[in-house]
């Protein structure tokens, strides 16, 4: 078979399927999405998978944690010998720079974690013997993914390491430090890691920069910024954790973050307020249009129904009302729930 394999948050398969269908149609490639709710992945079946993968950059996909090009689908695999059919399916393929054996991040997929781990250890030497895997990981070469959907059912796929998530299952394993004021700190940590390239992070998040955190309490996002030695104005009528204020980098203003505006332009504005997504998109656009910040990261809380439609509408609304040349990226992060995280930076 030919197509794209994309992982997603369990329950968001319809949104990812709609996104892939819309984006494929936009670039003129015919295909269809194959999925079931709670699978944790979507297969977009098409004849021009490599061409579609090249046109749909991983960082531009909103609901996809990972993007892979499918090589083969194997069903009815003998549990006593899974290696032979995989080697046969890979005959004629180029040498891969690494191997990841995975499973969907879903209720049905998680019990396959043990199989994935042990089978990877068995498959690596067989691939090397067949000349299909380098002796050591080579990140510049394509990466082979084996995704077990069941003990006898697997998808074989390939990733371009420069255009795919650099973490197994597309999930960055971030640790919540004891001093973090809230779990929401992981959202901003992941956003900086996922939405910005290493070069962009180095250039755009520097010590001494100034930022605003709208709706800051109890201070999770503010705390993440102070760890980068950024000066933060935290705007919220609620209290911040004492140790966040003790950094000496934080000014706490007891005000409504939705209506406050800075006296001078800032490098960053971040916002994780619980509010209607269109209202948030419009307010964030005002910040950019008025020049109150150069760059922003904000969350949009999605409705229970028509989430892809609402996502597309909110992003279009934001870009139209911002009236600036912007680079906009959005992602449903692993640490997001019924929401997406949006990055907008000056182009």
Swiss-Prot record:
Task: Please give the catalytic activity noted in the UniProt record.
Answer: cytidine(2498) in 23S rRNA + S-adenosyl-L-methionine = 2'-O-methylcytidine(2498) in 23S rRNA + S-adenosyl-L-homocysteine + H(+)
> Which catalytic residues are annotated?
301 (proton acceptor)
Per the record, its GO cellular-component terms are: cytoplasm
Which Pfam families did the record assign?
FtsJ (PF01728), RlmM_FDX (PF18125), RLMM_N (PF21239)
Tell me which UniProt keywords the record has, alphabetically: Cytoplasm, Methyltransferase, rRNA processing, S-adenosyl-L-methionine, Transferase
Principal localization? cytoplasm
- Biological process GO terms, please? methylation; rRNA processing
Q: Any keyword Cytoplasm?
A: yes
Assembly, in brief, is: Monomer.
The name on file for this protein is Ribosomal RNA large subunit methyltransferase M
Instruction: Give the species.
Output: Xanthomonas oryzae pv. oryzae (strain KACC10331 / KXO85)
């Amino acid at each position: 078979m030919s197509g794209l394999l994309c992982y997603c948050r369990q329950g968001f398969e319809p949104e990812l399927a709609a996104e892939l269908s819309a984006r494929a149609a936009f670039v003129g490639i015919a295909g269809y999405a194959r999925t079931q709710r709670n699978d944790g992945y979507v297969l977009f079946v098409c004849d021009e998978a490599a061409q579609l993968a090249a046109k749909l950059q991983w960082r531009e996909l909103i609901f996809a944690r990972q993007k892979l090009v499918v090589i083969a689908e194997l069903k009815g695999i003998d549990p006593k010998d899974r290696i032979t059919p995989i080697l046969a399916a890979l005959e004629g393929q180029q040498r891969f720079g690494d191997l990841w054996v995975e499973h969907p991040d879903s209720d049905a997929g998680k019990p396959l974690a043990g199989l994935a781990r042990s089978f990877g250890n068995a498959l690596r030497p067989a691939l090397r013997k067949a000349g299909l895997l380098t002796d050591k990981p080579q990140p510049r070469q394509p990466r082979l993914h084996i995704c077990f959907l069941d003990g006898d059912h697997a998808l074989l796929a390939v990733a371009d390491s420069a255009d795919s998530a650099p973490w197994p299952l597309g999930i960055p394993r971030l640790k919540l430090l004891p001093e973090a004021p809230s779990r929401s700190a992981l959202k901003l940590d992941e956003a900086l890691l996922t939405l910005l390239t290493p070069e962009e992070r180095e250039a755009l998040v520097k010590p001494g920069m100034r930022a605003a955190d709208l709706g800051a309490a109890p201070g999770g996002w503010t705390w993440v910024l102070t760890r980068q030695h950024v000066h933060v104005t935290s705007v919220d009528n609620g209290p911040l954790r004492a140790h966040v204020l003790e950094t000496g980098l934080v000014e706490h203003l007891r005000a409504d973050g939705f209506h406050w505006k800075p006296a001078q332009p800032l490098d960053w504005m971040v916002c994780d307020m619980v509010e209607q997504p269109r209202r948030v998109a419009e307010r964030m656009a005002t910040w950019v249009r008025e020049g109150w910040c150069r760059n922003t990261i904000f969350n949009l809380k999605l409705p229970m129904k028509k989430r892809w439609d609402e996502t597309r509408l909110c992003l279009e609304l934001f870009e139209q009302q911002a009236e600036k040349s912007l680079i906009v990226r959005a992602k449903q992060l692993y640490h997001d729930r019924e929401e997406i995280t949006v990055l907008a930076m000056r182009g």
